[in-house]
UniProtKB/Swiss-Prot annotation:
Domain notes: Lacks C-terminal domain that mediates direct interactions with nucleoporins. Contains a novel CRM1-dependent nuclear export signal that compensates in cis for the loss of the nuclear pore targeting domain.
Pfam families from the UniProt entry: LRR_NXF1-5, NXF_NTF2, Tap-RNA_bind
Organism: Homo sapiens (Human)
Location within or outside the cell: Nucleus; Cytoplasm
Domain RRM positions: 113-192
Nucleus in keyword set: yes
UniProt similarity note: Belongs to the NXF family.
Lineage, highest ranks first: Eukaryota, Metazoa, Chordata, Craniata, Vertebrata
Gene encoding the protein: NXF3
Protein's name according to its UniProt entry: Nuclear RNA export factor 3
InterPro entries in alphabetical order: LRR_dom_sf, NTF2-like_dom_sf, NTF2_dom, Nuclear_transport_factor_2_euk, Nucleotide-bd_a/b_plait_sf, NXF_fam, RBD_domain_sf, Tap_RNA-bd
Entry keyword set: Cytoplasm, mRNA transport, Nucleus, RNA-binding, Transport
GO function term, MF aspect, one: RNA binding
Length: 531
């Protein structure tokens, strides 16, 4: 059944208008949630502003339709941010690892020094730790300023590739307790040691460049431009790439090489001050000190040949604020702990050295325990130019700082009282000055006394007769029979003495310091005294 042509046209117009209204509602509802993917389609959708139904119909009939799964504007912005971040990451990945290790210093310069930190590295020996790291590291490195700080071990390396290689070692090495050792790498400034370190060859190159660029007529030199002088750039001094190092080095060279050149602004500060004179309150090098004494000391330390200070003859510089006329504290003398111990020890020493100096030392057998030990030491090697008075002590010396042979150490340790007395009898005959004795009771219990004796003696026979030597003797003793002491350990250390006038003031066998607190000798003991 056919419809009239007019009816067909009207019906078609209604359908187009209905579709247009539906599209407007649909577009307003979802315009904020969807956008065409193609930018060209996106721009064409904004051209539907004239309300023409035919245009709306044409748009509806086009292949472009609403796609509910397209990316929203919010998410698309996020994707752009991710793309930007990905682009940055790709650029970063394109850099070699060594370049990524380089960090910016606080002053904005690109640093080539790195600080290597081993957490809790204080428990590791320096040599052991560095060898362990070097064995695992793919490149050799030279640690600079190895030190311990805050329980950690730290050192510096120069070169980003070395720092990157050390970073790769982290977690790949283990200590003796089978714990992983971590390594942290951070950019750092130039270590203090490097500022002071400069090879002689580079010093000569700096001197040459400074002499060529110095304006002698005006006594001027631009040190800031020194690293970029042709002589410095052409030679492999690495100064142009490290101006700080050049500045620090050139200042040191400047003082000794071109002393006439003064820093800018320093001329006015020194006006009116003649050579050899200074004023403490006008010194430009001491403005940081608040008190005058510190100011004066600092000037005298910098200028030790100064003749006149503040119009007066300059005093001598004092070290650490200590006045030159002050002396060290004097010795406090002997220490015994109690009066009873004092009498016991002094009486023992008098009896011991009375027999020791008598010429027949076999009487000392009763003073030693059956299993006692004895050792003798002197502070010289047989090859050293020691005084002749020590020659007889060399063969018995058991100085373990010098003697490394374990067999000889064991042989020279005298064991049992018979060996001890035989060794003592072989030593030169002596005469001890009891008035020079200083006794230190450094440990005591109910069953043991430990004390040291310091004093001097002289040899009374042989080629070294009359020579005076000093000694320190350490006794460990236990209570013996007849309220006396029994020696279980005896260590004798003999050394040279530089006391002036010692021989003339020594050798009263029964000094007043001892006789006042110790009973006098018996008649039998008096007979043993040499006439």
């Amino acid at each position: 059944m056919s419809l009239p042509s007019g009816h067909t046209t009207g019906h078609t117009d209604q359908v187009v208008q209905r579709r247009a209204r539906c599209w407007d509602i649909y577009q307003r509802r979802f315009s904020s949630r969807s956008e065409p993917v193609n930018p060209g389609m996106h721009s064409s959708s904004h051209q539907q502003q004239d309300g023409d139904a035919a245009m709306h119909g044409a748009h509806m009939d086009s292949p472009v339709r609403y796609t509910p799964y397209t990316i929203s504007p919010y998410n698309r912005k996020g994707s752009f941010r991710k793309q930007d971040q990905t682009h940055v990451n790709m650029e970063r990945e394109q850099k070699p690892p060594e370049r990524r290790m380089e960090g910016n210093m606080p002053d904005g310069t690109l640093g080539s020094w790195f600080k290597i930190t081993v957490p809790f590295g204080i428990k590791y020996n320096e040599k052991w730790l560095l060898n362990l790291i070097q064995n695992e590291c793919s490149v050799p490195f030279v640690p600079v300023e190895f030190h311990y700080e805050n329980m950690h071990a730290s050192f510096f390396v120069e070169n980003a590739s070395i720092a990157y290689a050390l970073k790769n070692v982290s977690g790949k090495i283990w200590d003796e307790d089978n714990e992983k050792i971590s390594i942290f790498v951070n950019p750092a400034g130039i270590p203090h040691f490097v500022h002071r370190e400069l090879k002689s060859e580079k010093v000569e190159q700096i001197k040459l460049a400074m002499n060529q660029q110095c304006d002698v007529s005006q006594e001027a030199l631009d040190i800031q431009r020194l690293p970029f002088y042709p002589d410095m750039v052409n030679r492999d001094t690495k100064m142009a790439s490290n101006p700080r190092k050049c500045m620090a080095a050139s200042l040191d060279v400047h003082e000794e090489n071109i002393p006439t050149v003064m820093s800018a602004g320093e001329m006015d500060k020194w006006k009116g001050i003649e050579p050899g004179e200074k004023c403490a309150d006008r010194s430009p090098v001491c403005t940081t000190f608040s008190d005058t004494s510190s100011n004066i000391n600092s000037i005298l330390e910098l200028f030790p040949k100064l003749l006149c200070l503040d119009g007066q003859q300059s005093p001598r510089a004092t070290l650490c604020g200590t006045e030159a006329h002050k002396r060290l504290p004097t010795c406090k003398g002997s220490f015994f702990g109690s009066e009873m111990l004092k009498n016991l020890v002094l009486q023992f020493l008098q009896q011991y050295y009375l027999i020791y100096d008598s010429g027949d030392r076999q009487g000392l057998l009763s003073a030693y325990h059956d299993e006692a030990c004895f050792s003798l030491s002197i502070p010289f090697n047989p090859e050293d130019s020691a005084p002749s008075s020590f020659c007889k002590f060399f063969k018995d010396s058991r100085n373990i700082k010098i003697l490394k042979d374990p067999y000889l150490r064991g042989e020279l340790l005298k064991h049992t009282k018979l060996d001890i007395v035989d060794s003592l009898s072989a030593l030169p005959k002596t005469q001890h000055d009891l008035s020079s004795f200083l006794v230190d009771m450094w440990y005591q219990t109910e069953w043991m006394l430990c004390f040291s004796v310091n004093g001097v003696f002289k040899e009374v026979e042989g080629q070294s007769q009359g020579s005076v030597l000093a000694f320190t003797r350490t006794f460990i003793a236990t209570p013996g029979s007849s309220s006396s002491l029994c020696i279980v350990n005896d260590k004798l250390f003999v050394r040279d003495t530089s006391h002036q006038g010692t021989q003339s003031a020594l050798f009263t066998l029964v000094p007043t310091a001892f006789s006042s607190s110790v009973p006098a000798f018996s008649q039998e003991q008096q007979k043993m005294l040499p006439s």
